[in-house]
């Protein structure tokens, strides 16, 4: 007899709902809903359209339950972005997109308080201005954190909107550049350097634990029972790394998407000057395994090209764009 679970996989350009059936030996996957993830621009700023994404998530949940009564739900997303909740549990504003320009130049300013080398040694995370830490510095300087009750990374935000439960899973927390590579806890000393209040940071929970069940309001709205929502690796890269069909303990992987991640799994983080110089990042995966990886630009340029074609009324598939590129007689970059 099959048992069913639902995976909600949200990337920076698209999302999907995958129904998994387990018969005791094999897991079979079925895509039941796919949707685009289109940011919204307003007043020169770029935001994630969380209300629309929630509508797509709920549509996927309903479509999957019509096929099979799944027992639990899990969510993963891209890294570094987050939502700020007010005391009444509502969003302070739509979550900012990591490609929003507000963090431009923030690294130079941050180095007045801590060097990039010291920051890497503390967190093991590649120092990039899009990281959660630097986004929160901008929020703190603008006064936005004054009205914030809690900060939730994106997978935990969606789980909260389904359950009402506040926590963050370890893998997604490790992308924030605010977790100590040595202790695995929020680095309070680092946060104090930038006057980021520790009170807004949620409890870090392990992958494989429960987030809770669908809230009564969600159950009533969608016509679903009290389905369990599990905390899995919230960062999509760590889900991919864990699922990679490696035959040995020592292996490398390449996870392709908007970003492509090239890396390997280790028992301990690599915090050396050489690793920092090579722009390697230490993230935490399932079972507290460390993933040492390199961020690569990935398919973002292709995705944006397709989006621009669509704006012009040309709805090319990725396969069609590939064919067009192969037929190009001047394969130069400009």
Tell me the role of every PLM-derived stretch.
Residues 194-207:
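A conserved helix-loop-beta module that forms one wall/lid of the active-site cleft
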Residues 34-35, 96-103, 174, 258-260:
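Short, acidic/turn-prone active-site loops that include or flank metal/cofactor-
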Residues 1-93, 121, 147, 219-229:
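N-terminal glycine/serine-rich phosphate-binding loop of ATP-dependent small-molecule kinases
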Residues 6-7, 19, 104, 111-123, ...:
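Active-site core segments that coordinate phosphate-bearing ligands/cofactors
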Residues 43-46, 116-126, 200:
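Short glycine/proline- and acidic residue-enriched helix-loop micro-motifs
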Residues 62-99, 123-130, 141, 159-180, ...:
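Short beta-strand-loop/turn "lid" adjacent to the catalytic site in phosphate-handling enzymes
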């Amino acid at each position: 007899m099959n048992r069913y679970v639902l995976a909600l996989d949200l990337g920076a350009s698209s999302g999907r709902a995958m129904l998994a059936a387990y018969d005791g030996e094999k897991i079979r996957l079925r895509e039941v809903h796919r949707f685009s993830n289109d940011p919204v621009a307003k007043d020169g700023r770029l935001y994630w359209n969380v209300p629309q994404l929630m509508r797509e998530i709920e549509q996927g949940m309903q479509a999957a339950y019509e096929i099979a009564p799944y027992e639990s739900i899990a969510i993963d997303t891209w890294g570094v972005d987050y939502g700020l909740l007010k005391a009444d549990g509502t969003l302070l504003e739509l979550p900012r997109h990591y490609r929003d320009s507000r963090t431009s130049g923030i690294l130079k300013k941050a180095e007045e308080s801590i060097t990039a080398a010291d920051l890497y040694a503390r967190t093991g995370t590649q120092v990039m201005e899009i990281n959660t830490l630097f986004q929160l510095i901008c929020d703190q300087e603008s006064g936005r954190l004054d009205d914030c009750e809690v900060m939730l990374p994106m997978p935990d935000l969606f789980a909260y909107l389904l359950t009402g439960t506040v926590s963050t899973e370890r893998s997604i927390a490790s992308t924030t550049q605010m977790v100590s590579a040595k202790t695995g806890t929020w680095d309070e000393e680092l946060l104090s350097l930038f006057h980021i209040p520790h009170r807004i940071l949620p409890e870090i929970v392990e992958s494989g634990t429960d987030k809770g069940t669908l809230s009564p309001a969600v159950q009533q709205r969608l016509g679903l029972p009290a389905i369990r929502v599990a905390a899995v690796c919230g960062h999509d890269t760590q889900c991919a790394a864990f699922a990679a069909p490696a035959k040995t303990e020592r292996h490398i992987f390449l996870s392709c998407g908007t970003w492509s991640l090239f890396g390997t799994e280790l028992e301990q983080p690599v915090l050396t000057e050489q690793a920092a110089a090579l722009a390697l990042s230490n993230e935490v995966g399932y079972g507290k395994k460390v993933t040492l990886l390199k961020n690569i630009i990935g398919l973002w340029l292709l995705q944006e090209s397709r989006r621009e074609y669509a704006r012009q009324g040309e709805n090319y598939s990725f396969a069609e764009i590939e064919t067009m590129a192969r037929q190009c007689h001047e394969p130069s970059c400009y």
